[in-house]
Structure formats: C-alpha cells, structure tokens
C-alpha cells in the first residue's frame, strides 16, 4: 500500500507537476487547495477539475480571506505589473507569509492522515524572487514541522517537506511534467486573467510560463487574451 502525502495544489503549472511527481514517487496524493481571496480564482477552478484526473485520493479546498490582511497585488486592488523585466527583487505579487500559511494547513492535515510527507511545487530558479520559494525556507519549515506536532515530538515519524521542482528551470519542469503525462492545457498560471479566464500574457507568471515552454521547444496550450509568442 502506498504512503499518503499531502500535496499543495493550486491548479497551476508547477503544483500540477508536483502532484504528478508525488504519484511517480509512489505516494497516494491528497491534494490541498486554497480560496484565499486571490484575484486569479480560475486557477482554483482548474484544480477542482483536474485533481480527480491526476489520481488525487481526496481534494480539500480551504476557504479563508487574505484580503483582510492585504499587502499584495493578488489580494487587493493594486495593479499587477505587466511586461516588466523580471529581477531578483521581491515583487508586489508576493503574498505575505502565504507558503508558511499553506504549509501549516498541509501539516495539520498530514498529521490527521497519519502522513509524514508534504509536497510543494516551489521553484528557486525561474521564479519572481519570493522569499518562501527558497531552499532555506523549505528546510526551516521541515524543522518546524517536527518540533510543532504531537506526531513529531512523540517520535511517530519524521516529517519531510518535498520540493521536487526546487532546482529545476521552468523548461525542465515542463519537460518532466510531460514525461509524467501532465496535460498543461488544464493548468492556469496568470495572475490577472480576464473575466473569461484568459491569461493576460504579460504578468510575471505568464512571462515565466511562456519562456519555459519556448525554452522547452513546446507550444504552450494555455488560452491567452492577446497574441503571444509560443
């Protein structure tokens, strides 16, 4: 019988590949998504549709509202940058403590499930400078998980936070996902989609996605609101 793993699953390119990686590693994935007041809820709609198709044993969607905290263009009326040159500075699309919050929910569910494995699709190469996508953060949270839980303190097992995409480029992630059978037409990456759910093609996330597909030599199957170089 395969081991259970909680997989943070947004419906985006990286998290969908990460879920496929969990399955390939022999885990039974329990997908965990969040409706946190983000403007790009079409991503969550993709997650709801795709989770059963990729073999998730269960798919939990947790609702809470980070708009009450604000501090991000993804949870406020602040404009999402378009067409900028991506650098190492932390952008306005950073959501304060988001991955810490997400991983905390994942840890709680994992403890209830009797699982000691959590998967997250963070990437430290082709990303927008987010502090909670770095190896140091993953290592620190893993240590916290083993200090902050009944199961960890009682020595029932050792929690591990798996980040299989951490050191891959976006092109490598896409190629790996295709090897694992991921259908990227069922994923969404855009931070600021149209009301019809079309990707803008200009935000950081769209730029990184398009760049990844171009470098992989593969046409991006996503639907865009404007002509893009695929």
Curated annotation (Swiss-Prot):
Binding site for ATP: 9-19
Biochemical pathway: Purine metabolism; 7-cyano-7-deazaguanine biosynthesis
Cofactor binding annotation: Binds 1 zinc ion per subunit.
Binding of Zn(2+), residues: 190, 200, 203, 206
EC number: 6.3.4.20
Keyword Cell cycle: no
Catalytic reaction(s) noted: 7-carboxy-7-deazaguanine + NH4(+) + ATP = 7-cyano-7-deazaguanine + ADP + phosphate + H2O + H(+)
Cofactor: Zn(2+)
UniProt keyword list: ATP-binding, Ligase, Metal-binding, Nucleotide-binding, Queuosine biosynthesis, Zinc
SUPFAM superfamilies tied to this protein: Adenine nucleotide alpha hydrolases-like (SSF52402)
Disulfide pairings: none
A GO molecular function held by the record: ATP binding
One GO BP annotation of this record: queuosine biosynthetic process
Family: Belongs to the QueC family.
HAMAP family: QueC
Protein's job: Catalyzes the ATP-dependent conversion of 7-carboxy-7-deazaguanine (CDG) to 7-cyano-7-deazaguanine (preQ(0)).
Entry protein name: 7-cyano-7-deazaguanine synthase
Organism: Syntrophotalea carbinolica (strain DSM 2380 / NBRC 103641 / GraBd1)
């Amino acid at each position: 019988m395969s081991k259970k793993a909680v997989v943070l699953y947004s419906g985006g390119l990286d998290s969908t590949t990460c879920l496929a990686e969990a399955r390939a590693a022999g885990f039974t994935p329990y997908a965990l998504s969040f409706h946190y007041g983000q403007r790009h809820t079409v991503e969550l709609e993709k997650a709801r549709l795709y989770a059963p198709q990729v073999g998730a044993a269960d798919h939990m969607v947790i609702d809470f509202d980070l708009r009450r905290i604000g501090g991000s263009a993804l949870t406020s009326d602040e404009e999402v940058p378009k067409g900028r040159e991506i650098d190492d500075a932390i952008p306005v699309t950073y959501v304060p403590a988001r991955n810490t919050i997400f991983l905390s929910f994942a840890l709680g569910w994992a403890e209830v499930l009797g699982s000691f494995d959590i998967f997250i699709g963070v990437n430290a190469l082709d990303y927008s400078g987010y502090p909670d996508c770095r190896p140091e953060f993953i290592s620190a949270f893993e240590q916290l998980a083993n200090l902050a839980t009944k199961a960890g303190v009682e020595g029932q097992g050792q929690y591990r936070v798996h980040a299989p995409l951490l050191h891959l480029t976006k092109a490598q992630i896409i190629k790996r996902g295709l090897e694992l059978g991921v259908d990227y037409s069922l994923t969404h990456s855009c931070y600021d989609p149209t009301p019809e759910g079309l990707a803008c093609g200009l935000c950081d996330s769209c730029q990184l996605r398009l760049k990844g597909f171009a470098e992989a030599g593969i046409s991006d199957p996503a639907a865009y609101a404007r002509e893009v170089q695929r």
